[in-house]
Each structure stands twice: as C-alpha cells, then as structure tokens.
Amino acid sequence: MAAAQHRPVMLEEAVRALAPSGGDVVVDATFGGGGHSARVLRELGPGGRVVGIDRDPEARGRAERLLGDPRFSFEQGPYDEVLWRMVGRGERADALLFDLGLSSFQVDDPRRGFSYTREGPLDMRMDPGSGPSAADFLNAAGEAEIAGVLSEYGDVPRAQARRVAREILRRRPLRTTADLREAVRAAVGWAPRGGNPAKRVFQAVRIRVNDELGGLRRALEAAERLLVPGGRLVVISFHSGEDRLVKRFIAEREGRCTCPPELPVCVCGARPVFRRGPVLRPSEREVAENPRSAPARMRVAFRTAEPAREAS
C-alpha cells in the first residue's frame, strides 16, 4: 500500500497563534505526521524545545526524522495522561497545540478500521494495543447504549440511531468495517445528498471507543496548569462535540462576573484564567487543495496569571 500523505491543517494560522520564539517550550499534543512540530522548530532559537505527543504507536516512527534535533522530544501515549505527567514533574510550557481527530495515516490504512470506504478489521483504536476495539463495543453493548452513542457523538437523528442500533444487534457479531457499513445501509439506506450516514456512525463509534471527549477535557485541564502566564492554547477541532467542549472550557475560565446587576461592585470573586482569542476557519484555498480541512475550526486562548480552577 502506498504511504499516506498527511497535510497539517491550518498550519500557518496555528504557528502564528502559537507564536514560538527564542527559548519557548511548545507542546504538540497531537503529533500525527509532525508537520506542526517541524514548522515550530524552524521558528525557535537554540534554547527552544518542542515536545511531541501521540497515542498512536506508529507515530514514533514518523518522529524519527525530528529526533536528531536536540530541541525535540517525543512521548507516546494518550495526550491527557502525558500532559498530566508533565504537570506532575513540574514542567511548564509557553504554547500548546491540539490538532484533533484523525490523521490521514490512520484514515487511509484499512488495517486500522477507521474508514467506512476501506474494508478491514473493525478496530478504530488510536492505540491498537490498548482497550476494547469497536467490534468489542458493538458486539457487547445494548441497543439503547449504541443508539445513544450514535446520537451524542455522531449527531445521528434519534430515530435513525435506534434503527441502526437494532440492525447492529440483529447482525452480531460484527467483525469488519464492511459489516458495520452494511448494517447502516440496511437500516437507513444511502441518501443521494446530505452525506453518507455511515460517516457519522463510524465517527461516533470511534469517539466512544477512544473516549475522545473525556480525554480532551482532562487534557485541557492539564494544559491550564502547564501554560505559563501569557501562554497560548491553540485547538483545531473537526467535530461539533469537540468544538463545543473547547468553547465551553474557555468560556468557563474567562472569569465573567456572575453577580446580580444591581450590586455596585463584584463580590463573586470571578477571575479570568484564560482570555479568549480569535476563532478561525481554513481559507477557501486550503479547502480547495485539501477538502478534509473543510470542517476545521481553530480556537485560541491566552493563559493569565490567575490560579487554575479545580480539576473535574
């Protein structure tokens, strides 16, 4: 199989928001193909440092080309766990990037089971050696749980989600991506417009299998402690659930006063932990050149000197 080509999304916009310079420490929490890390290293001085993190064991091989640079290091594991280990070691960072979702390496490899267009084992784990696979989940969960996952994580209409869940139960055990794709086809058909419903189903199952939203929340709470005052948080998301979580996290930490309007002074003690930055979308040119970038949304926030909120 030809090697997949991964193009980092919103590369220049992300690097401008990260604003790396001099001796900064920059954490690339979703290393992927290393495009963002390589670009940041070009901007740093000899005393700077980039820490790359990726849950996918195959990412370590892609990091080899950068490991010859003494300013670069790589840690393999879920980003929330790695970031909290860094917090425990007393480390700090000047900028931190999350480029969420899948890399082209993962989507285009049928052995990983992420794509409904490529037949392979029904796996979908970011780390194939860790935790239950998509097949394990779908072959064990009840109808209500499966339908809830499809609605919550894939924005599948509830009636459709129930039909798909019933069809999955009827066809169990599911073993391949084709098994799941055909269950979706039998349950709701293929719409000529509006996108293939299998795309949302596969997305929802993947998010559930990898606990992506839970991991993101824990990682953002770690980032809150890692970033120095003035530190830059940059998050590129591709799914409405991810974006809502990031937006809510930043809003909760903007320190907006909740006192009744009739009070002359603030007594609620609200203090901003982050200042909200810009929200950006990919340019028309980037979307034309790389259609996978179309749903991307980039949120930026700046750390203040206020103490971190209590972790959930």
From Swiss-Prot:
The question of whether Transmembrane helix is a record keyword is answered with no
Keyword check for Magnesium: no
Catalytic activity field: cytidine(1402) in 16S rRNA + S-adenosyl-L-methionine = N(4)-methylcytidine(1402) in 16S rRNA + S-adenosyl-L-homocysteine + H(+)
The UniProt record lists the EC number as 2.1.1.199
Q: Which residues form a coiled coil?
A: none
Q: Which positions does UniProt annotate for S-adenosyl-L-methionine binding? A: 34-36, 54, 83, 99, 106
Keywords (alphabetical) are: Cytoplasm, Methyltransferase, rRNA processing, S-adenosyl-L-methionine, Transferase
Subcellular location per the Swiss-Prot or TrEMBL entry: Cytoplasm
* Biological-process GO terms, alphabetical: rRNA base methylation
Listed under GO cellular component are: cytoplasm
Kindly report the protein's main subcellular placement as a broad class: cytoplasm
Recorded GO terms, molecular function? rRNA (cytosine-N4-)-methyltransferase activity
UniProt-listed Pfam families:
Methyltransf_5
HAMAP family associated with the record: 16SrRNA_methyltr_H (MF_01007)
**The protein's role, per its UniProt record:** Specifically methylates the N4 position of cytidine in position 1402 (C1402) of 16S rRNA.
Give the family from UniProt. Belongs to the methyltransferase superfamily. RsmH family.
What is this protein's record name?
Answer: Ribosomal RNA small subunit methyltransferase H
**Encoded by which gene?**
rsmH
